[in-house]
Amino acid sequence: MAKFDAHLKCSFCGKSQDQVRKLIAGPGVYICDECIDLCNEILDEELVDSQGNRGQAADSSRKAAPAAKKSGKPAPTLASIPKPQQIKSFLDEQVVGQEAAKKVMSVAVYNHYKRLAWQGDGQGETEQTATRLHKSNILLIGPTGCGKTLLAQTLAEMLDVPFAVADATTLTEAGYVGEDVENILLRLLQKADMDVDQAQRGIIYIDEIDKIARKSENPSITRDVSGEGVQQALLKMLEGTVANVPPQGGRKHPYQDCIQIDTSQILFICGGAFVGLDEVVQKRMGRNAIGFMPTDGRGRSRANRELQTTQVLRHLEPDDLVKYGLIPEFIGRMPVSAVLEPLDESALESILTEPRDALVKQFRTLLSMDNVQLQFEPAAIHAIAQEAHRRKTGARALRGIVEELMLDLMYDLPSQSTVKEFTITQAMVEQHTGGKVLPLPGTEQQKTA
């Protein structure tokens, strides 16, 4: 019996009795003091949430007040909010293509901040001012690398509001391993330099939202802690609630000091690739009912398939998202949706050269610091775009290709003080090799690789 006792371990965490302070025995099972503490925390948290004790939340807010700041910036006014056409023009400078999505987002963002300014005007109570304006969160649907995150980030830059990005795949229900949804608000608060007022007017972008779709359309009788459970946990935050945010992050504890954040003024933008969603739409409409693109015996090209997918998704209805795995309550809190198109070779070429922070401009600037003038042949730009399109990761592939291409050049050119000019050719791109450096003006012409 003594030999058996020496190998007792917790039935929940697996730690032996030598690794814990106490090991409590039951009929055939054992539990350690650490697991008991964890269970108590989960039960206490559920108890506080169910009671909805506002008094305790207010006390927590007062205790945490030193960690938060008072806003030094005034609330937006109607006159200070850029008009939808101005917003879209600013987006055009940074984001190539996606005209329909930019128009949808410009109107939605304008209405959102107009709503905040309307509520903060402090006008007398009239029938018009008594009308409550509800916010409209945005759902972006599009393939990877098409500009979903960049759109949201550019909007925040223009409006000069805090902006935070969260990954939905890291979130879990309270009480399980992973991040609580309140940690999203903590990121926004940190971006606002712990200024609660500023954070409450910010923008949160939740990426990979399609990855928390439940496994089937029917409600599950088992726990889906990283799918439907996360959707349920996000509902109140998306709609607007006063959330208790632990200032140090991590799991909430019923007795710890928290910062209160009102999410009713925060604009939530959710994005995802939603792979296979077009098939759900086609199934509803009938596969043969949509004849956007002609077919031949050899089948459709990739460009035609991408165009057809975009055309199909323009007929998207909320019920299609339910069938995909989003719960109806979640969809109802994302009333504005926009479908982004896959980037074709022409769009990728434009991304390389046109935006304010285009890759070509970035590398020209880097080499100009070494007194080298960098040029790209039009054929080289086209070859880079072709390779990026082949990799199927959208605009994200462009930087990887250019970094590979420029590695040797960025290594050698700073040490060659006689080189003042260099041209990237199509052959260099296709072979991923560096060419001969350009001689100084007046000497023999460059020989292309």
Curated annotation (Swiss-Prot):
Residues 1-51 form the ClpX-type ZB domain. Residues 57-76 have a biased composition (Low complexity). Residues 50-80 are annotated as: Disordered. One of its GO terms (cellular component) is HslUV protease complex. SUPFAM superfamilies: Glucocorticoid receptor-like (DNA-binding domain) (SSF57716), P-loop containing nucleoside triphosphate hydrolases (SSF52540). ATP-dependent specificity component of the Clp protease. It directs the protease to specific substrates. Can perform chaperone functions in the absence of ClpP. This is ATP-dependent Clp protease ATP-binding subunit ClpX.
